[in-house]
C-alpha cells in the first residue's frame, strides 16, 4: 500500500479506537449487527458527502444540499399524492436533484460569484420552494406526506446478505465516485481545476462542463438521499436534510480534503463519515445530551481544520520556529 494512503489508515485506526472506547462504556457498541444497522441513521450524510468532496477538491463548495434533500423529499411526496406511479415519481425526483445541482453550477459559472454565496442563496431558494410545496400539499411540518406503498417504505429497512440497503447504496456510490475521481482523466481534471483554475483553462480542460458535472452529481446524490430518507421514515418532509450540513462538511475535511481545493480523498471521506456517525451514536448511547454532542462535532471540525492547516504548512512553521530560535526576542 502506497504511503499516500497514510491519512486514510490513520482515520481507520481512529475509527477502531473510537468503537472500542465507546464499547467499554456500553458493550452494545461492540455488537456487529448494531454497528451495521445503526449506519442507516447517518449513512445518507455519506452519500451526499462523497460528491461534495469532489466539489471541494475543485475549489468550490455547495452548502445547499440539505435544502435540496428537503425539496426532493417533499416533491416525491407531492408527485405520489398526485397519482404519479412510484417508479416514475422516484425518477422525476432524481432529475429534480440533478437540476438543482445544475442551477448551482450555472449561477456560479455565469455570475463568477463565490460558490459559497451562490449556494447560500440557493439554500434559501430550495428551502423556501420545499415549504411552498409542502403548504400547497397540505402537509404539516412534523407529519409531512405519508401513505406510501409498503414496498417502498420497507425498501430502506431491508438487508441484503446481512447489510442494510442504505449502506449498500453508500458502498456503490463510494466505488463509483472513487473510480471517477481517482482513476479517470475527468477526475484528474478536477484536481487540476482546484489547484489552479486559470492554468486549467489554458490547458484546454473543460472547466465549465466539469463543474456542471460535479454540482449535478451532488444534487443527484441529494435526491438519492431524499428517496432513502422518505423510505426509511415513511414520510416526506421538507426538513429531512436540515441537519446534514455540518456533519457532511466535517466528514469531507476530516477525510483529507483541502477546503481551498486541489486535494482530497473519497476513501478518506467515507471513513470520516463512519467516524463522525459513530461518534454521534456513541455519545447518545453514553447518555450525552444532543446539544453537547453537536458542540463536540463542531469542536471536531475546528480541530480538524486547524490540524490540516498546520500539516499543510509544517515546513513554513518549522522555518519560522528556527528563525525565532536563532533570533530570540529581547
From Swiss-Prot:
Phosphoprotein found in the keyword field: no
InterPro entries (UniProt xref): ABC_transp_permease
Assembly and interaction partners: The complex is composed of two ATP-binding proteins (LsrA), two transmembrane proteins (LsrC and LsrD) and a solute-binding protein (LsrB).
Name under which the protein is recorded: Autoinducer 2 import system permease protein LsrD
Keywords tagged on the record: Cell inner membrane, Cell membrane, Membrane, Transmembrane, Transmembrane helix, Transport
Any one GO CC term of the record: plasma membrane
Keyword hit for Nucleotide-binding: no
PANTHER family: ABC TRANSPORTER PERMEASE PROTEIN YPHD-RELATED-RELATED, AUTOINDUCER 2 IMPORT SYSTEM PERMEASE PROTEIN LSRD
Periplasmic side stretches: 26-42, 137-159, 231-237, 280-285
Bilayer-spanning residue ranges: 5-25, 43-63, 68-88, 89-109, 116-136, 160-180, 210-230, 238-258, 259-279, 286-306
NCBIfam families: PRK15038.1 (NF011612)
CDD domains, A to Z: TM_PBP1_transp_AraH_like
Protein family according to the UniProt entry: Belongs to the binding-protein-dependent transport system permease family. AraH/RbsC subfamily.
Gene designation: lsrD
Localisation per UniProt entry: Cell inner membrane
Regions of this protein lying in the Cytoplasmic compartment: 1-4, 64-67, 110-115, 181-209, 307-330
GO terms, molecular function: transmembrane transporter activity
Pfam families to which the protein is assigned, alphabetical: BPD_transp_2
Entry function: Part of the ABC transporter complex LsrABCD involved in autoinducer 2 (AI-2) import. Probably responsible for the translocation of the substrate across the membrane.
Bilayer disposition of the protein: Multi-pass membrane protein
Amino acid at each position: 500500500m502506497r504511503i499516500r494512503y497514510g491519512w486514510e489508515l490513520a482515520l481507520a485506526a481512529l475509527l477502531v479506537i473510537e468503537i472500542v472506547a465507546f464499547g467499554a462504556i456500553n458493550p452494545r457498541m461492540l455488537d456487529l449487527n448494531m454497528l451495521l444497522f445503526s449506519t442507516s441513521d447517518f449513512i445518507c450524510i455519506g452519500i451526499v458527502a462523497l460528491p461534495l468532496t469532489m466539489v471541494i477538491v475543485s475549489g468550490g463548495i455547495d452548502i445547499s444540499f440539505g435544502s435540496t434533500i428537503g425539496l426532493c423529499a417533499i416533491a416525491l411526496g407531492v408527485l405520489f399524492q398526485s397519482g404519479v406511479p412510484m417508479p416514475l415519481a422516484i425518477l422525476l425526483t432524481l432529475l429534480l436533484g440533478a437540476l438543482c445541482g445544475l442551477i448551482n453550477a450555472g449561477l456560479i459559472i455565469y455570475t463568477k460569484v463565490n460558490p459559497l454565496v451562490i449556494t447560500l442563496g440557493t439554500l434559501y431558494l430550495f428551502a423556501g420552494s420545499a415549504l411552498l410545496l409542502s403548504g400547497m400539499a397540505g402537509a404539516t411540518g412534523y407529519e409531512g406526506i405519508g401513505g406510501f406503498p409498503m414496498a417502498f417504505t420497507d425498501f430502506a429497512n431491508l438487508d441484503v446478505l446481512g447489510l442494510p440497503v442504505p449502506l449498500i447504496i453508500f458502498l456503490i456510490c463510494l466505488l463509483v465516485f472513487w473510480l471517477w475521481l481517482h482513476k479517470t482523466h475527468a477526475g484528474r481534471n478536477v484536481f487540476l481545476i482546484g489547484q489552479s483554475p486559470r492554468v486549467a483553462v489554458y490547458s484546454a480542460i473543460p472547466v465549465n462542463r466539469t463543474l456542471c458535472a460535479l454540482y449535478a452529481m451532488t444534487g443527484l446524490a441529494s435526491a438519492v438521499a431524499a428517496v432513502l430518507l422518505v423510505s426509511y421514515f415513511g414520510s416526506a418532509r421538507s426538513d429531512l436534510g436540515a441537519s446534514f450540513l455540518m456533519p457532511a462538511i466535517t466528514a469531507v475535511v476530516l477525510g483529507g480534503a483541502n477546503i481551498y481545493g486541489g486535494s482530497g480523498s473519497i476513501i478518506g471521506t467515507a471513513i470520516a463519515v463512519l467516524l463522525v456517525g459513530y461518534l454521534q451514536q456513541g455519545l447518545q448511547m453514553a447518555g450525552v445530551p444532543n446539544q453537547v454532542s453537536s458542540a463536540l462535532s463542531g469542536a471536531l471540525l475546528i480541530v480538524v481544520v486547524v490540524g490540516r492547516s498546520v500539516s499543510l504548512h509544517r515546513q513554513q512553521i518549522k522555518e519560522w520556529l528556527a528563525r525565532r530560535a536563532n533570533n530570540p526576542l529581547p
